Amino acid sequence: AVMVIAIWLIAAVLGWYIGGMNLAISISKTVYHEDIRTVGSGNPGFTNFRRVYGDKYAWFIFIFDLLKGAVVCLLFGLWFRYLGFDFQLGAAYTGLFIMLGHSFPVQFSFKGGKGFLVLLSELFVLDWHAGLIAFIVMTMLLLTTKYMSLSTMCALTVGAVCLFIFRCNIPAAVSYAVCVLFMVVRHKENIKRLVKGTDNEFHLGS
């Protein structure tokens, strides 16, 4: 019983703390001596960092955020399964706190990113079929519209629906869907700009 209580608490605390590790903020402060949250769109994530500072460190941030979500969700999912719980439930529960930590990092005054990469990597852990479909949707939309925000919101929404279609653990699927909804809400300024046709475009080669 103690171990069961411990894993739920450890997953929540570690998930939030690791989720709060933000290379975009750390590198912008260390290398460029300014806070990424005060330049560009103000979002401390891969897209804004790349737009402001270029490719030099941006892809490290991209890889780190993907690994941050995938590795931690995978490890805790396996630990939950070892203790007799559903793997997907453990991974999604941990992913919920990683997302909260990424959005409201204790280390950075609770002002974090929107969490797309974290949620995409978590989706692959929950069901790689759903993750692959979401990635394809994102890629196709990004190539045709050039809008990263639109592509990510649509891709993860499709991914969340796929979890239900592929009979994912229901509490896990619901938890993931709530995270996606939360991410979409955090894109409200992007949505306003998309409606006006003024949102920033994303170009892979620039």
Predicted regions and their residues:
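Helix-coil boundary and interhelical linker segments in multi-pass alpha-helical membrane proteins
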Residues: 1-11, 73-93, 124-130, 163-175
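N-terminal signal-anchor transmembrane alpha helix
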Residues: 4-31
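Hydrophobic alpha-helical transmembrane segments
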Residues: 5, 9-13, 59-63, 91-96, ...
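Transmembrane alpha-helical segments that form the membrane-embedded catalytic/substrate-channel core
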Residues: 17-26, 95-106, 181-190
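Cytosolic, membrane-interface loops and tails of multi-pass inner-membrane proteins
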Residues: 25-58, 192-206
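Short, non-helical or kinked segments that cap or interrupt transmembrane helices
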Residues: 35-45, 107-120, 147-155
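Interfacial segments of multi-pass membrane proteins
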Residues: 50-55, 76-80, 97, 101, ...
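Multi-pass membrane catalytic core of lipid/isoprenoid biosynthesis enzymes
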Residues: 51-77
